[in-house]
Structure formats: structure tokens, C-alpha cells
Design a protein with these regions (language model features):
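C-terminal motif of bacterial Sec signal peptides marking the signal peptidase cleavage site
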Residues: 17-20
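Short, low-complexity, disordered segments immediately C-terminal to signal peptides
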Residues: 22-47
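Beta-alpha junction/loop-to-helix N-cap segments that form part of ligand/metal-binding clefts
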Residues: 27, 107-114, 125-196, 261-267, ...
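Solvent-exposed, acidic/polar segments of extracytosolic/periplasmic ligand-binding ectodomains
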Residues: 45-81, 407-472
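Extracellular/periplasmic periplasmic-binding protein-like sensory domains
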Residues: 203-204, 300-375, 457, 464-470
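Extracellular/periplasmic ligand-binding modules, especially the Venus flytrap/periplasmic-binding
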Residues: 233, 241, 245, 290-293, ...
């Protein structure tokens, strides 16, 4: 029972990752290359004649050591004195945590490790981090072995970069105790989100919550002010449920339906739909996995009732969800995202660079949004290391990473404030249609590139989430 319950938790908890779009190994990300083909062939931009936007005479941005609008990311140099674990005169060891080897969900967050491998191959081709070869240590937590992987990393790694684990509070502070720094791809539990010695490139704070999607839909559907929330009562989803309810109430929504479904074997979907209809629900959010949302949508279709709009977290931007649930989907189903969908590669050079990076340096690897989020951590680490120069240290990495203003990973995602406490003010709207996931420019009302950046896109939360509030 513990294994089954935790397996379901692994599925649902991933909704907490800021822009996570995870899936098992046999699933494909929207906009990514189909199985057996290369991501770069599928979505290369039409820039300078070579599909990368760079001049043919000089090669792509990657050939020049750049990524998006970042230049000279990795390069040769004269390494300084090695004084910390994982740092030698010739190498720098970086650990990437995933749950890809879990028996319950094979391939979970595989894309993060695959991005790490691709980054290291490209970076080392250009001289490494200040002349040091990047060595990626594979820290596969397999859901239940996070504590063991942290113990290993404490003995071998200079930093954790670009990874994450579903049960990321299992080490009980061991990472911090050994002085190991972390630039994670994502953090899930409240304890992990506020942990010391950490800079999140795409922050998932506890006491700030991205409200852009609700704000946009509130403007588009002002009459839809009766919210229904359906969720599964497991550790991670229970936190995001509480955050959504607090945010919605602060925005003026009346939460008239707040129910839990069973993590395994739920059959009462029509009953939920009937109760939502009877309770007058006009706005709806479901917290969990796409498979359960498909079952609920089918029940809505059978009952002939849909809410005025449905808002979902970014983990629903999934090809399997579209394949199985597209025909029963409401016409007004939306989500917000800090990352553009893959079919915008022609408009977003850094997105094209990510696809090219994977095609060239890890062609068998998975391309997915969480892979991009992990890559943001590696790019932030490299930029910070460049600023540290010969005086490379863990303390310097944290200082320089946290000092980056408007971090976009070269344009890969919206502007972020690296750290643990500040949610992005910049998002875009995705409309889930029967034909796929589409950037909704009209709903987004972009004011900075393709994004809407507005202070009102974030709500400050005041309820107690069991961890200290950030210092003023």
C-alpha cells in the first residue's frame, strides 16, 4: 500500500514544479520530436539559413559558445586553486538528481538528466567551466532513495544543478549540513523550497503564488466567480490546493466546491460533476495528473455540463492528455506558463537552441519543458562561475547566481528573480484546444515580448504553510 500510495503521489506532486511537464519514458512532450526522430529536425527556426538564426559562415549560436542571448557561456581558462569537494585542477563535479529509475514511474524526470548530459557535452567542447571539464554525476533517487543520493553527493560533488526529486525533504537537512549548494530544476515540498544554500533559477516560493492565469480568466469571464476545486489529499498536492484556495479567495472567487478524489481507483466522476453543477460552479481547477482529468472531462461530456472555464497547472500540457481527452475537453480550458510551447521555436531563439543542443549532444534524450527548466540551472551556474573567475567557490556561485537580474536563461523562459522567495511576474497563457496547446496572445496581452509582466500576476499568501516566512 505504501508503494502504491507513493507512486500516485509521484504523479500528482509534479504539478508543483513551476513549469513541469513530466511524463514516463514512452510519452512525448507537445512540440517535441516524435519517438525515433530528432527534436532539432522537428522544430528548428528559420533564422540565418541553417535553422539557428546565426550566420552560416560562423555556424550556430551553439558553435560560437552562446545560447540564446548569452555569449561565451563555457570557455577555456586557467583554473584556480581547488579547495572544495568536487573541484579539482581539471574537473568540476556537478550532481543532477532525478527519479528516473523508479519502478513505480520509470523515466520520471529523465529529461532533466538528459539536459545535463547535453549541456556537459556542449560545454566541454568549448573548454568547460573556466578550463575545468564538467562531469555530471547521476543521482537517481528512484523516489525513495533521495537521502542516499544526497549522502553520496556530499562526498563527491561541488554542487547540485538542474535536478529535483519528488520527495525532496527526505534528507532532513543533510545537504545543507555538508555545505552542498543547489541550483535545482525544481523544488516541491515547502521545506525544500525554502532550504538554505540554494538558488532556484525558476523559483517556486511558498508565500508567493502565480495568479496570472486566474487574473486573465477573471477578466475574460467576469461572471465566473464560483470556484470548484478537486484534488487528491497527498503531501504535495495538499500544499498547492491550499495555495490555490487562498489565492482565489483573495481575488474575490467564492469557493463553493472543494472535494477530494481517491488517489487510486476513483469511479465517482459523474457524482463530482453533478455536485459541481448543483453547487453552481462556474470556474474549475483540478489538481493532479492528466489521466484523472480525462476521466472527469468524459463525465462532464456525459452529463452535458461544463464550467464556464477550467484552469489547469502546467503539468497538464501533455500529449497523452490531448490524445485521450481532446475530444471531451471544454472549449475554455487554459493554463499559464513561464515557458513558450515548443512550436514557437521560430519566434524564440533560445528555444531553438535547446532543441539543437539536444539533437547534437544527446540525440536519444528526452526533450520536455522540465528539461528546459533544468537547463536553466546549468546556464545560471555557468554564468555565475564566469563571474567568479579564478576565485570559484560555492559561496561565490550562490552570490553571483542570486544577483542575476531578470534571469531568462538566454531567453528560454520569462524573466525570473533567482532565489527561493520571489515568483515571476511574467507568464503567458496557453489555450488547450482539440488541435493542441496554443499560445493565446489575446488572453496574455503581452507587454514584454511574448509575456505579460504585471505585479498583479502574483498574490502574496498569508496563511501558514509550515515553514518560515522570508525576511522582509
Amino acid at each position: 500500500m505504501r508503494t502504491a500510495r507513493h507512486a500516485i503521489a509521484a504523479l500528482a506532486v509534479m504539478a508543483l514544479a513551476t513549469a513541469a511537464c513530466t511524463r514516463s519514458a514512452d510519452e512525448t512532450e507537445i512540440g517535441a520530436a516524435p519517438a525515433g526522430s530528432s527534436a532539432g529536425d522537428q522544430a528548428a527556426p528559420d533564422g540565418g539559413g541553417n535553422g539557428t538564426g546565426a550566420d552560416e559562415a560562423t555556424g550556430s549560436r551553439l558553435d560560437q559558445g552562446g545560447f540564446g542571448d548569452l555569449e561565451n557561456v563555457c570557455h577555456d581558462g586557467e583554473p584556480g586553486t581547488a579547495t572544495e569537494v568536487g573541484l579539482t585542477a581539471d574537473e568540476i563535479h556537478l550532481g543532477t538528481v532525478t527519479d528516473k529509475g523508479s519502478a513505480e514511474r520509470p523515466g520520471l524526470t529523465q529529461e532533466m538528466y538528459d539536459s545535463a548530459v547535453a549541456f556537459a557535452g556542449w560545454c566541454n567542447e568549448h573548454g568547460g567551466i573556466g578550463g575545468r571539464k564538467v562531469v555530471i554525476d547521476d543521482l537517481d533517487a528512484k523516489l525513495f532513495e533521495y537521502n542516499q543520493r544526497i549522502a553520496e553527493a556530499c562526498q563527491q560533488d561541488f554542487a547540485l544543478v538542474g535536478g529535483g526529486a519528488v520527495f525532496d525533504a527526505q534528507d532532513n537537512g543533510a545537504r545543507v549540513a555538508c555545505g552542498l549548494i543547489n541550483l535545482p530544476g525544481y523544488a516541491v515540498t515547502p521545506q525544500a523550497r525554502v532550504a538554505d544554500l540554494q538558488v532556484q533559477p525558476v523559483p517556486n516560493p511558498v508565500y508567493e503564488f502565480a495568479s496570472a492565469g486566474y487574473r486573465w480568466l477573471q477578466g475574460a469571464y467576469p461572471e465566473a466567480d464560483k470556484l470548484g476545486v478537486l484534488w487528491v489529499n497527498l503531501d504535495g498536492p495538499s500544499t498547492i490546493h491550499a495555495q490555490i484556495v487562498e489565492m482565489a479567495e483573495k481575488m474575490g472567487f467564492d469557493v463553493v466546491f472543494d472535494e477530494q478524489y481517491r488517489p487510486l481507483g476513483e469511479t465517482g466522476w459523474r457524482g463530482f460533476v453533478q455536485k459541481m453543477r448543483d453547487d453552481g460552479v462556474t470556474a474549475f481547477e483540478m489538481i493532479g495528473e492528466p489521466e484523472n482529468m480525462v476521466a472527469l472531462q468524459q463525465a462532464m461530456q456525459t452529463e452535458g455540463w461544463y464550467p464556464t472555464f477550467t484552469h489547469l497547472q502546467p503539468n497538464y500540457m501533455d500529449e497523452k492528455f490531448m490524445q485521450e481527452g481532446g475530444s471531451s475537453m471544454s472549449d475554455a480550458t487554459y493554463m499559464r506558463s513561464a515557458f513558450p510551447p515548443f512550436d514557437m521555436a521560430e519566434q524564440v531563439p533560445a528555444l531553438a537552441d535547446y532543441l539543437e543542443l539536444m539533437q547534437r549532444y544527446n540525440p536519444g534524450g528526452k526533450t520536455a519543458m522540465l528539461g528546459m527548466q533544468g537547463l536553466s540551472g546549468f546556464l545560471l551556474f555557468a554564468v555565475a562561475a564566469n563571474e567568479c573567475g579564478e576565485d570559484l567557490s560555492r559561496a561565490c556561485i550562490l552570490e553571483k547566481a542570486a544577483a542575476q537580474d531578470g534571469w531568462t536563461a538566454g531567453g528560454l523562459h520569462s524573466a525570473q528573480t533567482p532565489g527561493n522567495t520571489t515568483a515571476t511576474r511574467c507568464d503567458l497563457a496557453i489555450h488547450a484546444t482539440a488541435d493542441g496547446f496554443v499560445y493565446d496572445e489575446a488572453l496574455t496581452e503581452p507587454n514584454e515580448g511574448i509575456y505579460n509582466c504585471d505585479p498583479d500576476n502574483v498574490i502574496e499568501l498569508t496563511d501558514d504553510y509550515g515553514v518560515p516566512r522570508p525576511a522582509a
